[in-house]
Amino acid sequence: MTSSSSPSRKALSKIACNRLQKELSEWQVNPPTGFKHRVTDNLQKWVIEVTGAPGTLYANETYNLQVEFPQHYPMEAPQVIFVPPAPLHPHIYSNGHICLDILYDSWSPAMTVSSVCISILSMLSSSPEKQRPTDNDRYVKNCKNGRSPKETRWWFHDDKV
């Protein structure tokens, strides 16, 4: 997998283009609550504004997600990261990488950008405290040069937050 900063990213397949155009059309009609697609002319890279849910630690806070779609989306998961500054959360690293199983091992082609966004908002909303992952400094140090979070071998051990 190439990093997000790689200029050699492959063009989307016809299936991926059709799927993303459909998802974008549906999003424009019925966006998930708390999210706003920031319009660009690049179907392969979306920027999505996330607003924390009312009554949570992140209420009224706004963050940006960057979603990069691989050539064979939806058969392959998109790369989803928070554009720094990332929210303080036990599963979100300071470089924006997100430890969430559906972005990696548990990805299914039935998932959509909307369902991923809802999962991320749910993860934020359920957090009882704002803090970085305990291994944040070590992980970020090892992710230099724009390494993709999809190159990480994640260990999903905590589903409480």
Curated annotation (Swiss-Prot):
* Enzyme category, top tier: transferase
Q: Does Chaperone appear among the keywords?
A: no
Pathway-wise, it operates in:
Protein modification; protein ubiquitination
Q: Which SMART domains match?
A: UBCc
As given in the record, the signal peptide range reads none
Write the record's keywords in alphabetical order, separated by commas. Answer: ATP-binding, Nucleotide-binding, Transferase, Ubl conjugation pathway
Biological process annotations from GO: protein ubiquitination
Under Gene3D superfamilies, the record lists: Ubiquitin Conjugating Enzyme (3.10.110.10)
Q: Name one GO molecular function term.
A: ATP binding
Q: Which reaction does it catalyse?
A: S-ubiquitinyl-[E1 ubiquitin-activating enzyme]-L-cysteine + [E2 ubiquitin-conjugating enzyme]-L-cysteine = [E1 ubiquitin-activating enzyme]-L-cysteine + S-ubiquitinyl-[E2 ubiquitin-conjugating enzyme]-L-cysteine
Residues annotated as the enzyme's active site: 99
Q: Provide the E.C. number(s) assigned to this enzyme.
A: 2.3.2.23
Tagged with keyword Nucleotide-binding: yes
Give the top-rank taxon of the lineage listed in the UniProt record for this protein. Answer: Eukaryota
Q: Which residues form the UBC core domain?
A: 15-161
Q: Which family does it belong to?
A: Belongs to the ubiquitin-conjugating enzyme family.
Identification of the protein by name: Probable ubiquitin-conjugating enzyme E2 18
